[in-house]
Amino acid sequence: MTTCLRLFFRILSPIRIGCVKLRRLMFPPQAISPVLTAVAMACLAHGVVWAQSTVASTQLPTGGVVSAGQASISQAGSTLNVNQTSQRAIVDWSSFNVGQNATVNFQQPNAQSSTLNRVMDMQPSQILGRITAPGQVILVNPQGVYFGKSSSVDVGGLVATTHTAVADEYLKGQLKFNRNGATGKVENEGELRAALGGFIALLAPEVRNSGVIVANLGTVALAAGEAYELQFDGSGALSNVRVTPATINTLVENKHAIMAPGGLVILSAQAASRLQ
């Protein structure tokens, strides 16, 4: 029997969603109000230990190869620029870490542009510095993605996930992701900011936010499951995340601020059986 909890918040004014933790739960539709109370009380204050190597303050992504679309990669000091001329591009990286004093700029044609970054490293990506883009940045690392306390991401839209993107669908404009055995996690302790009407989506078997996520008139999605499909409305806004239940333990935890005035917040943790 599938167990799940999906919460949708339509935000009419700035809101701070404090401590929310979801772990393979199931409630009937009529129990939604009690669920909100139970989830709010379920927060446990505990840290997360990441098995990760030290990242130099000026560290930048390495080994970038453009495998689809048109883009070039250049570096000047502690700044790396991805100069993209096509609407969509796929870049494969040997590693994707951004040091505290480093910056990665995705120079895309417009706000509807998108760059899929596939990381081949055997270690989680550590984002401790700055990432900017007018359009969408999609960061895929099966080992995990960590946004440190010093990180600052300012983009049109962001997906950080451990799940593999379906490349053919991506190039057609669809955002679909499959776990393919990945067990890494995505955690934010920094500041993730989407452009007006944009989105921030953190997708992994385990998702934690103890930082700040901002998407004015946009969408914030924290989701845990086996597969995901991001669905957009006619205006291009993220309106839903379709989550396939996972075959492993899943968890979504929010311990700090999600601000989406006039927008939507989606929290979804789904698994294929009850937590024992």
Model-derived regions: residue spans:
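Extracellular and secretory-pathway beta-repeat/beta-biased strand scaffolds
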Residues: 2-276
